[in-house]
């Protein structure tokens, strides 16, 4: 499979925004010694999000115990203790940034008995203690199928529970070798089962070698497992050691994914565009919660 990384189309070229807020957010994160997935995963939207005073916090990192070949987060299989001050620092950042909606994600921590579920809970508690009106979205790993760990997170009552399906099942062995497609679907199905009031969310990348029909089948699977919100974005290879881009999906095709997701499958929201990432414009969920209250 040949890489297309050197032929990036115009619709994927992002101008670096000039805004004093970007420096403020970056300095605050540095002062509080907090990681963001925006920085660690080289997100193309980092300038826009920082300019808007938002960030997706990456806890328990920065190293990940899995080495998915599409991801730019550093691999680190060493056993590392959790930082007990991290939740408090995260809560302080949310307060100082005045966030109305916060996204908290993590690296995979397969070295921990509960996969880091307890740290997620502590972060939820810290955010609610420092900023009671802030809605909370979690983007969680699969916890290796540890459903007790999953229940621990659900019992903390996040407003949105996100777990990314990432790609089509045919490509799992290549792109997500330590993940299981059916296990991820099972996790998403359990969101509604455990907490009917929590909105469930999942995202996938295109451009890894899937077909459009396979994308639609994933949408069908997500719908069948009670997912409310879906994000679809273009895969961009972080470097030569990562999986190459197989194709650049056009904006028109992304619009077709969105239309299919909303009209055929009836998701509450489908965010689909070349630069969409799982937490891009995540704050719009507050409007969604007003339209579809639970």
Curated annotation (Swiss-Prot):
EC number: 2.8.1.8
Pathway recorded for this protein: Protein modification; protein lipoylation via endogenous pathway; protein N(6)-(lipoyl)lysine from octanoyl-[acyl-carrier-protein]: step 2/2
InterPro entries in UniProt: Aldolase_TIM, Elp3/MiaA/NifB-like_rSAM, Lipoyl_synth, rSAM
Co-factor binding comment: Binds 2 [4Fe-4S] clusters per subunit. One cluster is coordinated with 3 cysteines and an exchangeable S-adenosyl-L-methionine.
GO MF assignments: 4 iron, 4 sulfur cluster binding; lipoate synthase activity; metal ion binding
Entries under SUPFAM superfamilies matching the protein: Radical SAM enzymes
One GO CC term on file: cytoplasm
UniProtKB keywords: 4Fe-4S, Cytoplasm, Iron, Iron-sulfur, Metal-binding, S-adenosyl-L-methionine, Transferase
Binding annotation for [4Fe-4S] cluster 2: 64, 68, 71
Annotated localization: Cytoplasm
Record-listed [4Fe-4S] cluster 1 binding positions: 38, 43, 49, 279
Requisite cofactors: [4Fe-4S] cluster
Residue ranges occupied by any Radical SAM core domain in the UniProt entry: 50-268
Catalytic activity line of the entry: [[Fe-S] cluster scaffold protein carrying a second [4Fe-4S](2+) cluster] + N(6)-octanoyl-L-lysyl-[protein] + 2 oxidized [2Fe-2S]-[ferredoxin] + 2 S-adenosyl-L-methionine + 4 H(+) = [[Fe-S] cluster scaffold protein] + N(6)-[(R)-dihydrolipoyl]-L-lysyl-[protein] + 4 Fe(3+) + 2 hydrogen sulfide + 2 5'-deoxyadenosine + 2 L-methionine + 2 reduced [2Fe-2S]-[ferredoxin]
Annotated family: Belongs to the radical SAM superfamily. Lipoyl synthase family.
Database matches in HAMAP family: Lipoyl_synth
Protein name: Lipoyl synthase 1
Organism: Prochlorococcus marinus (strain SARG / CCMP1375 / SS120)
Gene: lipA1
């Amino acid at each position: 499979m040949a890489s297309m990384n050197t032929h990036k189309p115009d619709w994927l070229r992002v101008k670096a925004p000039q805004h004093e807020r970007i420096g403020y957010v970056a300095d605050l994160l540095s002062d509080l010694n907090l990681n963001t997935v925006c920085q660690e995963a080289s997100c193309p939207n980092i300038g826009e999000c920082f300019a808007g005073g938002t960030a997706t916090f990456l806890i328990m990192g920065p190293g990940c115990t899995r080495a998915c070949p599409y991801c730019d987060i550093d691999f680190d299989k060493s056993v590392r203790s959790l930082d007990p001050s991290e939740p408090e620092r995260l809560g302080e950042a949310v307060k100082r940034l005045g966030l109305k909606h916060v996204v908290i994600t993590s690296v995979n921590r397969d070295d921990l008995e509960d996969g880091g579920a307890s740290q997620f809970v502590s972060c939820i508690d810290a955010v609610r203690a420092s900023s009671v009106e802030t809605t909370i979205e979690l983007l969680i790993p699969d916890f290796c199928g540890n459903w007790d760990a999953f229940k621990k997170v659900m019992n903390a009552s996040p407003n949105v529970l996100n777990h990314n399906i990432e790609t089509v099942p045919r490509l799992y062995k290549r792109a997500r070798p330590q993940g299981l497609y059916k296990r991820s679907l099972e996790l998403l199905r359990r969101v509604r089962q455990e907490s009917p009031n929590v909105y469930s969310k999942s995202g996938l990348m295109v451009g890894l070698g899937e077909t459009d029909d396979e994308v639609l089948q994933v949408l069908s699977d997500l719908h069948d497992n009670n997912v409310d919100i879906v994000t679809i974005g273009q895969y961009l290879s972080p470097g030569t050691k990562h999986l190459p881009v197989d194709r650049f999906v056009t904006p028109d095709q992304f619009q077709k994914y969105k239309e299919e997701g909303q009209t055929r499958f009836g998701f509450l929201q489908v965010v689909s565009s070349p630069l969409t990432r799982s937490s891009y414009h995540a704050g719009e969920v507050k409007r969604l919660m007003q339209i579809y209250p639970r």
